[in-house]
Amino acid sequence: MLNKAQLIGFTGADSEIRTTLKGKKYALLRVATSRYTKKEGERQDFTTWHQVEIWSPGTVKWLEGRVLAKGSKVYVEGEIRHEQYTDDKGQKHYFAKIVVAGPGHELKSLDRPETNPEPEPDEEG
């Protein structure tokens, strides 16, 4: 089976490092991708926002040492996951996110490629 998402876009906010209740660190990014069409001779832009969670330890460590600032151009490769939560009013909300967590998943800065993290070792051996 294959579940793979690839994005090239721009960060909508500075990267953020968080820690779970059990002490595991992960990073969050918001990435915008755009597509363009011409309608009646005028260019129209359509932007889609993507929530990205990074769990790969080497990439999280790399992000701890720097901030991917708002507006940074990035390449993201991960898997699509669908989540849900219930708000204070009991209303269910559904959303999708891109998760960078396993072999073959990666995050790269396209602004400064020389600073990119080393690829994660293949955890499947």
Positions of predicted regions on the chain:
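Single-stranded nucleic acid-binding surfaces, predominantly the OB-fold ssDNA-binding core
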Residues: 1-125
